[in-house]
Swiss-Prot record:
It comes from the Bacteria. This is Probable nicotinate-nucleotide adenylyltransferase. HAMAP family: NaMN_adenylyltr (MF_00244). It catalyses: nicotinate beta-D-ribonucleotide + ATP + H(+) = deamido-NAD(+) + diphosphate. One of its GO terms (biological process) is NAD biosynthetic process. GO terms for molecular function: ATP binding; nicotinate-nucleotide adenylyltransferase activity. The keyword Nucleotide-binding applies. Signal peptide: none annotated. The lineage of its organism: Bacteria, Pseudomonadati, Pseudomonadota, Alphaproteobacteria, Hyphomicrobiales. Pathway: Cofactor biosynthesis; NAD(+) biosynthesis; deamido-NAD(+) from nicotinate D-ribonucleotide: step 1/1. Belongs to the NadD family. It comes from Rhizobium leguminosarum bv. trifolii (strain WSM2304).
Length: 192
C-alpha cells in the first residue's frame, strides 16, 4: 500500500488543500492520503488557531475523496514535531510505503523544521506546486541540499519505490487560496 502523508494546521482547511490532495493521489498513484491535522505548529503563532475539533470537522467536510483519511493522531502522541510523528507512523506501519506531501510554499521554511534533514532521509517527498512558488522552490535549502535526490516529475508514480532521500516537484492546477488570507478576510472561504 502507498500512502501520502499530508500534514498541516489546516486553519482553516479549504479547496486549495483538497486540490493538493487530489493531485497527490492522482500523480503519485496513492492508495490513501492521510490528512494529518496538527494540534499546532511550533513555527506559527497559536493566537488565531481554531480548536482542533473544529479543524478536523472542517477538514472532513472539505476532503471529499474517500481515499482521504482525516486524522489528528498527533495529539494523542503528545509530540509537536513532524519528524517525531513520522518516525512513529513508520515504526507502526512497516509494510506501508509512505510519501510526505507538502506544498511548494512550505519549502522556504522547511529547513527550520526540527530534524528536517532526517525527514528527507527517511521519506520520499512530493512537493506540489503553489502560486508564487513555481520558481522560488529552486532556491530553498532543501532543494539545494538534496538536488542529487530529485526524481523527474514524469516518474512521480514510482516515487514510493525510490529509497530516501528522493523528492519530486509536481506541477499542475494551482489554487491561490491560503488559510492566512481566509482568516484575515482577504478572500472568501470556498470550503462550502
Amino acid at each position: 500500500m502507498v500512502v501520502g502523508l499530508f500534514g498541516g494546521s489546516f486553519n482553516p482547511p479549504h479547496q486549495g488543500h483538497a486540490l493538493v490532495a487530489e493531485i497527490a493521489i492522482k500523480r503519485l498513484g496513492l492508495d490513501q492520503l492521510w490528512w494529518m491535522v496538527t494540534p499546532g505548529n511550533p513555527l506559527k503563532s497559536r493566537n488565531q488557531l481554531a480548536p482542533l475539533a473544529e479543524r478536523i470537522a472542517e477538514s472532513e467536510r472539505v476532503a471529499a475523496d474517500p481515499r482521504v483519511k482525516v486524522t489528528a493522531f498527533e495529539q494523542s502522541l503528545g509530540v509537536s514535531y513532524t519528524a517525531n510523528t513520522l518516525a512513529w507512523v513508520k515504526a507502526r506501519n512497516p509494510h506501508v510505503h509512505f510519501i510526505w506531501i507538502m506544498g511548494a510554499d512550505g519549502l522556504q521554511t522547511f529547513h527550520k523544521w526540527q530534524k528536517w534533514q532526517e525527514i528527507v532521509r527517511t521519506f520520499p517527498i512530493a512537493v506540489i506546486d503553489r502560486p508564487g512558488a513555481t520558481l522560488s522552490y529552486l532556491s530553498s535549502k532543501m532543494t539545494r541540499t538534496f538536488d542529487f535526490a530529485r526524481v523527474d516529475e514524469d516518474d512521480a508514480r514510482i516515487l514510493w519505490k525510490k529509497p530516501a532521500p528522493a523528492w519530486t516537484f509536481i506541477h499542475g492546477p494551482r489554487s491561490g487560496l491560503s488559510s492566512t488570507a481566509i482568516r484575515n478576510g482577504s478572500v472568501p472561504d470556498d470550503s462550502e
